[in-house]
Amino acid sequence: MALSLLSYNVSDLCLGKPPLRCLSSSSSSVSDAIAALKSSEDTFLSVWNCNHDDDNNTECECLGKISMADVICHLSKDHDHSLCALNSSVSVLLPKTRSIVLHVQPSCSLIEAIDLIIKGAQNLIVPIHTKPYTKKKQHNDNVSVTTTTHSNGQRFCWITQEDIIQFLLGFIAAFSPLPAMSLSDLGVINSTHTVVAVDYHSSASAVVSAVSNALAVQTSVAVVDGEGDDPFTSLIGEISPMTLTCCDETAAAAVATLSAGDLMAYIDGANPPESLVQIVRNRLEDKGLIGLMSLFDSLSSYSTSSGYSSEEEAPVRTTSYGRSMSSSARMARKSEAIVCNPKSSLMAVMIQAVAHRVNYAWVVEKDGCFVGMVTFVDILKVFRKFLENDM
């Protein structure tokens, strides 16, 4: 039965997928990206090298993807010139490597798609055929965000690691006995030495670097309590880029000033504790970070910059420091880590990760000892080897 999967291609995974919304790398700024992300139901937006406001025959190419977490990391690093950083080209938010987003044809086989994901791709861009489309402007005319439509009417969607895992779950019986086997027996656990982790008391600079690294590999930052010679004894929680995507740009001030433990508390739930809000403000003042201070206090920056006359007219407004109303409504997540143990079955971990919309799960022993992490890529490697042996 597993051999029947060889007949599927990525077009089978595109059914029901909405066309991508995009930003132009040549005409969009970081500020545009913030407005677009706040008004979008999507966590990520694609960035392209063609300007969809112009009617030309230039071949479109997706350069990468961005989220609010990318914005927050960018602003927290450039804290001396935060307001200027908002006017930078959106391209500064893109990762240095272009290989994480790849164009493929609809005829690309499922096996080929899995191989690309294993080699490092995070999203596969696939052309889709839809009815003729008339581009509609955003309510904010200063933001150039459209559904990706080329001059020949071509539009695109993308396939993620999660899409492939969900598709394989529909054929899980074909991989017997793998689904019932434990993580330890399958050897898919990444040790603590290979995961992105920081100590609970780590400084803000260490946190910024760790979050950036986790973004690049599409995982998360483990917050640990180190004891003795082993700095990664127990897992306390995580700082997830997916949690940061629920925040707004003012969270950059918290990332730039708080320790790992305090940042976990700040982004946990809907509203940060007032005590932490005051700590962030005090540290911004102590360090003379005027740019971040101005950003931190601009709670209505999006509504104001967009020129809306009232809160009712604005598609998104900020309800509290660091938290976006639309984002928290569609993906409210606490910083509590998603965990399993080495004896958890492969299928249980897959379902757990998919249910929480993450690409990984932390692995912890029953006594609380931190073991490591298992990712969707690790799981896909197991399935790929199984299919290879069956071919």
Curated annotation (Swiss-Prot):
Q: Which domain of life is it from?
A: Eukaryota
Can you give the residue ranges of the CBS domain? 16-81, 331-391
Gene label: CBSX5
Q: Which UniProt keywords apply?
A: CBS domain, Repeat
Query: Which processes are annotated in GO (biological process)?
Result: cellular response to hypoxia
Official protein name in the record: CBS domain-containing protein CBSX5
PANTHER family recorded for this chain? AMP-ACTIVATED PROTEIN KINASE, GAMMA REGULATORY SUBUNIT, CBS DOMAIN-CONTAINING PROTEIN CBSX5
InterPro entries in alphabetical order: AMPK_gamma/SDS23_families, CBS_dom, CBS_dom_sf
